Amino acid sequence: MKKFLILFLIIFAFAGSSFSQDKFAIARIWTPVLNTDDFESVFGGKSGTKVKLDGKGLIREMEFIAFPNTVFNIVNTIPKNGYDIYEVTTEDYPYTSTKLYIDSRFVNLTDTKIQDRERLLPQKEIILENLKLMEGYPYMWGGNVADGISEMMEYYKPAKELTNRTEELWKLKGVDCSGLIYQATNGNTPRNTSSLVNYGNPVEINGLSAKEIAEKLQPLDLIVWSGHVVIVLDENTAIESTPAEGVNKTDLVARLKSILIERKAVDDWNSTSGKRFVIRRWVE
């Protein structure tokens, strides 16, 4: 009896240590990260033909799309019909205001944490070219893969043929404002504007006119506030992604004038409050 008890305790201890091991997931392809574990309610719904949108036509359940080879720490596993949903954390998205979820079919599992994806910042000229190539793409809340994810049509197969626009939404085609620069830099910039307002170094603009600000700007400077970012392309042009127009170029001075109507130019985001914006220079 004593030997049996000892054997039981050894087996129990071994099993407990096995179950307590951290598990990790590695994105094998572009991996959508949502703030809900009910992916099927977003892509398909009861009819199997609709994408869940809010009153502004946005998929608010979307957080971002993880690059291939992104490493996730699995916090919890939620079984579904033929696949799992994982509650996760990742260094690529350090925002804690909501839980994050991924679909098991987009990732591979490991019990050992491996090195995260390699982050190589493209040359400045390549980043600028990447931005220009995305002109004309639609706005996608939480999107940072302009061409979308074709596997969404396989893993969440629609019940019938979709309209072109619904298929774009289903595939998560397009980028949001910070997703535009995130994709152009291969995921080397912070994903959200709440971080971009302090990213890089400040450009002093307090009290300046739109023309005076424009004269100080360099390509890839960020005109940013918590909620939106506009990216400088050259001395005359900016680019941004908006719900109304998607990815579009604008006249730099004219865009600054429109911003100054509603917001105050400040040097340091954290030094004041209210409607304001800053310029951040993160690459020379």
Residue ranges and their predicted role:
Residues I239, T250-E284:
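Low-complexity, Gly/Ser/Thr/Pro-rich intrinsically disordered linker/tail segments
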